[in-house]
Amino acid sequence: MTANLLNLNVDTLFEQHSVSEIDEVHKKIQSVVENKREELRTHVGERYRDLLQAADTIAAMQTSAGTLMEQVRHVQANCRSLNEQQLLGFQSTANASAKDAALKERNAGKKLQTYYGTMAQIKLLTALPELIWTHLDNDRFYAATELFIFSRHISTGLQLDGQSALMQKLPVARKQWEILRPFHVTIKQAILTALEREELLQEMTVDCLQSLLLLDKSDLSTVLKSFLNLRSSAFLNCLQSGPSEPRRVKDRILASLNVLNSTVELLDKCLLGYSLLFSRLEECASSTCPPSINRMESSERQLVHLLPEIIAGFKPQFDVPQLTPEQLGSSLQQWLDKMNALAAAHLQQVFALVTNMQTIQDIKSAARTNGRPDFVRLEQQLHLKRSQLDFYARKYVPLINARVREIIRSSWASAMKLTYEQVLLLIEAGQSQPPLQIWREQSDDLPLSLAAALSDQPKRLANRTKGYDGATIELCKRFDSHLADIVQELNVMLQEQTTRAEDKVSLIEFLRETAEEQLTEYLSNLKGLELRERPALLLALRNSLALVELCPNLKLCFCQPSSWRQWTDNSAGLGIEHWQRICGLIEKEMLSFWLVIVDDVLAGHNCEEKLPKVINHEVVLSDFALWQTLTLEQRDEDQEQSVQSTIRIPSQPRLSLQTYLHQLIQALNSVVPQTLPPKVLQAFIQRLIGKLLCHYEGLAHAECTKASQNIALQLYFDLKFLERVFAISREERTLYDQIHAQQNQLRDYIDPFDFELFAEHITAHVSRAASRLQGELGVLTPSAAAPSQGAAAASSLAHEADPNVLCLSSSGSTSLWFPLLPIVMPQAAGRVTSAERKSPIQEPVEKTATTTPTRKSGGNGARKGDSSKSKSSAASFFGMSQEWFR
């Protein structure tokens, strides 16, 4: 049966069963309930027999006590009746009637007074709601709280007389209390809302704290905890900005700082020592404090004579609390820890909305204007850490500095990202103009005025010589404008007076580190593209190198302006070192791009394919240029008759070599129409000479070269020509040793006596050929300083100030206004030399002249020629007019 009842669906019982079935179910349920009761009684009776006996005993005692009390009441009634009967014979009838009349009159007056007092109290209850609302609207919270406590006191007294006949006829008293009861929550909510305000005065704070002490009868530590929690809520509310009331970020940050400072100041003025709150509590607890009825309107105060004394003289009672500095310090320390967590979570989010330095400067200026309170005394009294209460220095200044850094980093990253994207677009679009367009004359190539010529703006003609087209110049202009904004915003912060000197130095260093980091990342991204096409490589390296040359504000990020050096002291040299380092890094990375182009050009024009690998008679006839025939006249010491001999020496390099160099120049000009930087040219020449030396090494080991002195002499001439044209010096030790080793190898294939005769003339022909072909070699020709400076002349990728522009007027030591002095000397028969040209090969010539009899007359002639040449040079030099030197 029980199982059936448990499975019974109560929801469908009256829908699926008839009345008789429902009645049967009801009986079964009652039967089960009775059985359970019996089982419970049996179970309780067996296990808790003593408890049942105690309960029965208590019930019996209650009955006995009730009977005893009833008997006592009967005894009292009998005694009172007996007393009246005993005194009845001694009283006269007249006196009894007078007393009865007085008693009745007194009872009637008492009832009337009770009636008027009750009506006056009800009148007060009806007037209190409006009065409480008035005080709440005027932010007089303690007055509203005192009136609410007064109304509760009145209502409590009326409820105690609720069984009287009068109160039974006046239910309005109970209803009026139902109206006044919600004021407890209303007043408390208004107090809590007031304590959450941003601007909170001392008087209002004391009013609210006193109201909380009176309203909930709380102790002062609980009220202090509530006050600090509400100030935390006020701090969070300051940081919010709703859609209905949007607030500026600066206002929100300053308001939050004001809340923190004002909270500590209120604790100092209101709760520490004999402060305003404790003096107010003593006034309320003193006997001179007026009763609460005095807060009523004048019409209600006129009814005070009708009120009972307990109502008319009512006033709130206070026990003046005590709050030690240790308790206040402990509560304040807990609140500070909480505020640190809130500031880390919410204040940083608000600072993240600051987008420019001007807002930060306004925040710092406003914080300085509002003043920073000095809480040193309070920290000492409450045993807090030093500067623990300096919220601006501990919480806001670090966030300000962090935000300044983030603005610099984000601005730099945005500018660098935009520049990188524009470079990618230029690379994808390819060359916007034909290569030869760079050298076409345009109207805006030269400045149209002296002011334009003297300005710091990049000159268009100079930029075109470096391959910088309009798109590149525009890209650099945009990037430089972004950097100018960053420098200007940072300058605003540095000019701000409240910023510490160490913070200013830190910001300057951070700007330099950020610039270096962003440029390094840009180069890494550009290198990660793994460009292989020549136009793409040229666009990438041109735009990257242009950033250094056409963006003056980029240098300011490393080398500080003069206005910043008052804070950096000796770190200006360090900034120059960082600038040189980043320039070197850019040049190094761009040099790798240049080398890819150079290797590609050399791979497309391999000397092994362009030059003949074997020199036979056909190659000699087609490749060797016409040699020059010279007649030498020699005279012995004993014979006056001279001996003439004819020699043939090369006058220019092989035609295939000239053709190869010409084709290489054309290929290079088609790829790179602008001038090559010295370092790139040096790398190109080194690679080219390396390949040519490998080719000539193969020719030097060929049997045809070993068998033919003419072939060896022509190859020797070619190597001397390459050494002279490409200015291979001892500083380039590897190439220098390699080319001289091959020259010595080819020299071994030539007859020593013949080579002694050829050496001086070969040197002269090499110089003449180099001078004649130097213009044709064009871009392959190194700079004039290359022979003397070697690799040091190409230590930088930066172009000369004015490449490919004639020096019309200059006072520099390297620029000549006049050509070299002419040297007048008689030409010896068959000798083509100059006075200033001395080669290492001349020494063995002179030695041979002294040892070989056939060369004696020639040696004397040379010495005579040298002496006459010196005299002629000196005469021509000192014979000039002094007007030439002016």
UniProtKB/Swiss-Prot annotation:
One of its GO terms (cellular component) is Golgi membrane. GO terms for biological process: Golgi organization; intra-Golgi vesicle-mediated transport; protein transport. It is found in: Golgi apparatus membrane. InterPro entries: COG1. It comes from the Eukaryota. The modification Phosphoserine is found at S839. Residues 848-857 have a biased composition (Polar residues). Keywords: Golgi apparatus, Membrane, Phosphoprotein, Protein transport, Transport. Residues 834-846 have a biased composition (Basic and acidic residues). Its main location: Golgi. Residues 834-886 are annotated as: Disordered. It is a peripheral membrane protein. Component of the conserved oligomeric Golgi complex which is composed of eight different subunits and is required for normal Golgi morphology and localization. Required for normal Golgi function. Belongs to the COG1 family. This is Conserved oligomeric Golgi complex subunit 1. The lineage of its organism: Eukaryota, Metazoa, Ecdysozoa, Arthropoda, Hexapoda.
